[in-house]
């Protein structure tokens, strides 16, 4: 059994004829989120998918097997919900409530697409949206920080949040440290001046009272 263990970076340009000749690996979104997977190419060949943890495959990705052969990824048709609305406000509200539930969503022109879920379909209908069940490829938005994780699971959402926090710290950590140091210096100077006046200041009120004792 061949092992597929590499994904060619999207910015690497390959000859179209070379990619077209490569066998396809057709997977639904749930399977494309798995870095370890036993799968079957469209040719009928069984393969083992062993990719870096956290990899999310997208339609059109090109993979490399352990023998150097190319394999192209295709998004399978699956049960989805197509969400439309009579106005932008209703569609925005629908997107907000889906995001609040960490639901993977594919954003189209005037339409949202998500995996079929009857409970979500009912919620969206109550919000005033029009919901249609269909069979189509599903390719949701990637994570804002490149993680691309499946947000429906708390563990992967926590990973995306941790990554977002790391990016924030990298951009703002230095200025925060500088401010902290400044505050520390200020406190030090303040304490020093206070001690100096207490020991030597003839007009210090504490010294004046002490003299009367």
Curated annotation (Swiss-Prot):
The gene is ureE. Residues 170-213 are annotated as: Disordered. It holds the Pfam family UreE_N. The lineage of its organism: Bacteria, Pseudomonadati, Pseudomonadota, Betaproteobacteria, Burkholderiales. This is Urease accessory protein UreE. It comes from Burkholderia mallei (strain NCTC 10229). Keywords: Chaperone, Cytoplasm, Nickel, Nickel insertion. Its main location: cytoplasm. Coiled coil: none annotated. Belongs to the UreE family. Residues 182-200 have a biased composition (Basic and acidic residues). InterPro entries: UreE (IPR012406), UreE_C_dom (IPR007864), UreE_N (IPR004029), UreE_N_sf (IPR036118). It is found in: Cytoplasm. GO terms for biological process: protein folding; protein-containing complex assembly; urea metabolic process.
């Amino acid at each position: 059994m061949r092992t597929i263990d590499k994904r060619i970076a999207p910015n690497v340009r390959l000859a179209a004829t070379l990619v077209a000749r490569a066998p396809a690996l057709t997977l639904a979104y749930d399977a494309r989120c798995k870095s370890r997977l036993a799968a079957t190419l469209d040719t009928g060949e069984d393969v083992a998918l062993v990719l870096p943890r956290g990899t999310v495959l997208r339609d059109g990705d090109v993979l490399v097997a352990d023998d150097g052969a190319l394999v192209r990824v295709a998004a399978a048709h699956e049960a989805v919900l197509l969400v439309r609305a009579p106005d932008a406000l209703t569609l925005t509200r629908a997107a907000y409530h889906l995001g609040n539930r960490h639901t993977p969503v594919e954003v189209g022109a005037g339409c949202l697409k998500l995996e079929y879920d009857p409970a979500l379909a009912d919620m969206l209908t109550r919000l005033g949206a029009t919901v249609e069940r269909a069979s189509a490829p599903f390719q949701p938005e990637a994570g804002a920080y490149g993680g691309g994780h499946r947000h429906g699971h708390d563990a992967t959402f926590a990973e995306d949040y941790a990554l977002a926090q790391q990016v924030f710290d990298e951009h703002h950590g230095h200025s925060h440290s500088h401010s902290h140091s400044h505050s520390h210096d200020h406190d030090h100077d303040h304490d020093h001046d206070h001690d100096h006046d207490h020991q030597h200041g003839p007009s210090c009120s504490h010294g004046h009272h002490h003299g009367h004792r």
